[in-house]
């Protein structure tokens, strides 16, 4: 698909004009430039990557809806007008659309910048010679935040950098596009989705059964039950057996002598 082509080009493009000051690294580690995008296309690298490429997953989106703010934009005050929206859904970002409705008698005076939760900025419009009025139901789009986490506060800043013309930000909104991001809120090596839907553990507690073994360790290494602190019912916790005694937490009588481990200990 065209999205796969985008991904391949982002991953294989090379930095050009390395001395240019517009190059920066975004929140996902991609080199990006407001002049050059992701750089020059490396056709050979792109073809090689495409040969074993796995298609990207379904595109999802998060929308702020249009936010009515009716904020005056001061004339050449040196300070921008800022509006923000907090995104709670986790996407692995591809692109962001920004919608504005601005009344202004000389729109070229306006510098418009979007700042992501990562701190990465997209300059949507710089001061330029454009004597037209208004940004009426206008859409800007940026891929500068490619790969970043969508969660957190997004801020739109609008600054009038010219004299004698004033305006108002009437409405604004965001639509963020990307793929589902695997989240591991408690850092136990299991995604929140798998904890909730597969293992039924607490995605915000790394050790759901309080046996001193993380949920991820129990699922991926010891094969013990992350919701039962004594998987073999021998009166010893799984963590105590693994970390202290070295007994088998899945076998009540590790040494096969007719006495369970708990009785022997």
What name fits each language-model region?
Residues 32-34, 147, 162, 253:
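Short, flexible coil/turn micro-motifs enriched in small/turn-prone residues
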Residues 5, 36, 108, 152, ...:
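Residues that flank catalytic or metal-binding motifs in active/ligand-binding sites
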């Amino acid at each position: 698909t065209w999205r796969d082509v985008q991904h391949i080009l982002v991953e294989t493009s090379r930095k050009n004009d390395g001395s240019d000051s517009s190059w920066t690294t975004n929140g996902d580690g991609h080199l990006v430039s407001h002049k050059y995008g992701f750089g020059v296309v490396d056709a050979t690298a792109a073809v090689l990557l495409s040969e074993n490429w796995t298609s990207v997953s379904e595109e999802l989106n998060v929308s702020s809806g249009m936010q009515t703010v009716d904020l005056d934009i001061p004339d050449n005050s040196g300070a921008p007008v800022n509006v923000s929206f907090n995104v709670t859904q986790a996407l692995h970002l591809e692109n962001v659309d920004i919608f504005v409705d601005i009344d202004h008698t000389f729109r070229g005076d306006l510098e418009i910048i979007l700042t992501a939760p990562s701190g990465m900025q997209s300059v949507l419009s710089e001061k330029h010679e454009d004597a037209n009025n208004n940004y009426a139901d206008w859409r800007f789009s940026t891929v500068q935040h490619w790969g970043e986490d969508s969660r957190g506060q997004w801020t739109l800043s609008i600054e009038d950098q010219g004299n004698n013309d004033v305006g108002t930000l009437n409405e604004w909104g965001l639509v963020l596009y990307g793929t589902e991001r695997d989240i591991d809120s408690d850092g136990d090596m299991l995604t929140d989705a798998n904890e909730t839907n597969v293992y039924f553990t607490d995605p915000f507690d790394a050790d759901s059964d309080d046996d001193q073994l993380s949920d991820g360790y129990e699922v991926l290494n010891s094969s013990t039950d992350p919701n039962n602190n004594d998987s073999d019912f021998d009166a010893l916790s799984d963590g105590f057996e693994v970390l202290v005694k070295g007994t088998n937490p899945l076998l009540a009588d590790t040494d096969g002598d007719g006495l369970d481990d708990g009785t022997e200990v």
